[in-house]
């Protein structure tokens, strides 16, 4: 996954999953179970994979069919609206539908390995949280506490931390979404 470039995964009833990704991600993706990987040179602002994605979809579905996208609430296309419009224009014989519900249902299915990874990170986070009070000192800021917490997660086996809010205050906290402050 890239924070700036789209990555596409095509899931078909009749084919193994196919990844359509920027070429910079190919080496990493080859280490996974995905066997079919199509790439484009990126960055390429005039075509961030839409032509490769279009051709791949046409090869899978031929000239008609439904294309499900995660376009429901709490979802992201991970491509510009202009690129989405271009894709729909390129594939005008196809019907684009909201597949959010089925994608969420698929995400609920976990392998034994995924379950073990989830248990591991829950254990790591719980242990760090349970011991946090031993390391907090008077006059530490939320930023310092949050940074300590992140370091402890990493040093105890977490792969990375994407986002962490932090809040404090007399009698509790009044929000759970903001970044830590100098408070």
Question: What residue spans do the PLM features occupy?
Answer:
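Contiguous, non-catalytic segments that form substrate-binding/exosite surfaces or channel walls
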Residues: 137
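Short catalytic-site patches enriched in acidic/histidine residues
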Residues: 1-3, 100-102, 109, 140-183
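A composition/biophysics-driven feature that prefers long, compositionally simple stretches
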Residues: 1-124
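Active-site pocket-lining segments that scaffold enzyme catalytic pockets across diverse folds
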Residues: 122-132, 142-144, 150
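Functionally constrained cores in energy, signaling, and assembly domains
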Residues: 19, 103, 115-120, 133, ...
């Amino acid at each position: 996954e890239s924070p700036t470039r789209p990555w596409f995964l095509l899931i078909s009833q009749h084919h193994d999953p196919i990844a359509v990704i920027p070429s910079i991600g190919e080496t990493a993706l080859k280490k996974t179970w995905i066997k079919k990987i199509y790439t484009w040179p990126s960055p390429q602002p005039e075509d961030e994979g839409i032509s490769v994605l279009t051709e791949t979809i046409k090869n899978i579905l031929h000239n008609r069919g439904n294309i499900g996208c995660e376009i429901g609430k709490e979802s992201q296309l991970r491509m510009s609206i202009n690129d989405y419009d271009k894709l729909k224009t390129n594939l005008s014989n196809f019907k684009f539908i909201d597949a959010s519900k089925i994608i969420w249902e698929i995400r609920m299915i976990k392998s034994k390995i995924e379950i073990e990874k989830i248990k591991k990170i829950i254990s790591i986070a719980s242990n760090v949280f349970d011991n946090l009070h031993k390391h907090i000192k008077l006059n530490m800021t939320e930023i310092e506490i949050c940074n300590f917490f992140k370091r402890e997660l990493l040093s105890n086996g977490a792969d990375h931390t994407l986002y962490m809010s932090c809040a404090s205050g007399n009698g509790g906290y009044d929000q759970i979404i903001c970044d830590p402050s100098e408070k």
